[in-house]
Amino acid sequence: MGVKFYIDNWLTASSGVGLIEVLQDAEVEYKDLVKDSRKLELPEELFEKLPELYADFLTKGIDLTMKEQILKSKKLSIETLKNRLENPYTFINGYDIIKSFYRNSIFANNNPYKDIIKQENSKLLNSILNDIHRKEDMDYESIIDVLENKGYFENIRNVIKYYLIETLKLIISNQEDKNAPLCFFCRERHTYVYKGKYRVFGAEHFTPLSASEDTLPNLFWNGRNKMYLCPYCEFYLFFAAFGFTKVGNNRFLFVYIPDDLDSLISINSQLKSKEKVEKNILGELFRVVKFLRNVETQKARWILENIYFVEIEKVSEATANIYSFSISPRLAKVLKNYIDKYPPNFESVFPKFVEYVYSGRSLYEFLFKILSGFFFPKRYQNPKGYDADLIKKGMSFKEFLPKKLLYFIKFQEELIMGESFEKQINFAYREGLNLKKMYEKELGKEKAKDRIKTLSYRILEAVRRKDLDAFEQNLIRAYMQVEREIPYIFVQALKDENFNRIVYAFLIGLNGRDWSEGEPEGTSEESLGQE
């Protein structure tokens, strides 16, 4: 019989992902440990090694962190160096997240060995630094070399690792009381007596969910916390911090998928492997969407419909805000259908795109900002504010608008109307291109360019005001100029429900480029809107 841990909420899920991360760091194969979509089962011998693996994970790279800290010192002195390295425990891997997630736990403020670690460190440092103090003209790089050669970094890592293992043993060595209540998290093992009471889940086990009988008694039935903890699940919860990805100075993100442990592990691992994390939490959805490209269609849709993101924002040392959001079934369906179609050259505005669709804002507003940047670059010398990225994207198109912009029209129509109206949109786009060619044939390219620009300004303004009459009058004048009959599609555009998709597609075509006579569409030049 192995040691079982269950995954039935985002806290235990993040613990599971964190545990897997520690095992992967130790090059331990975890696939056989996943027994079903909600359970991890560790062999007894592996569980007994967990304290050592956990300590290895936390102390990995501590020498590099300490060296960086030494080099940050502006003033060269032995006292400065001692002060910098006074508390080496703070240099462990992920100390900032541990301090944020486990304040007042035995891993942070209440570590029983922290003073011993400082004393051991002081002995190691003094024995080396006293010799250095007698020498002159030593810079920090030279001091680091001396510390390295004297074995300081390796020795202090071993000291910290030893006491981390002892710390973890303090938890798992507690004997469960067979007469005590069952653990809230596993429902198999029993809790134990801690300071005269049965051990319960508290702020030290996950500070962002900081609630206890002492601080917030109203959260518990009759003021009593009945979330009992067995020693093993208490240890398990200390892996949760490693399941989250840091996305800012005080923000941490976890992607939760119920009943699908493999996808849960894969998606969160992918977030952690990124070199750059999006500043906006919604932008992380892009990574999930990319992950789902290779997932079977029905399963991918199920994941999108059931997934939700948990974001923890640290407010102070002891308090944090927890936010979560999920994806509506309709949006999940459209996202799945459009995964492979998102224009790669618009990836820079993807976080904004997701924010628009998730918050319910129309993508026609999104397009309006891009087109405004294209048509009025002089008006926006240095765009700032909420939609600055969209305006800058429009400004980047120097000569013409790329056809890829039609993607956003089709996405919006699919999301709101349940169909993409692809034929109608493509036809309106083609009519825009045709009118442009007629102008160029009638007036020449230079004069046509000015006429098209003026017409585009007026149509965009009509779109902004949703003024069907102004659009109709400008259209009549435009086609009279080239002595052509107005295509029937614009009769449909005068119906309110068709207006945006037809007019925006027409505008993009009117300011687009016909690739039928040149190189094929889709090149980088086309995407940038320049030749």
Swiss-Prot record:
Pfam family, one: Cas_CXXC_CXXC
Protein name according to UniProt: Uncharacterized protein aq_372
Organism: Aquifex aeolicus (strain VF5)
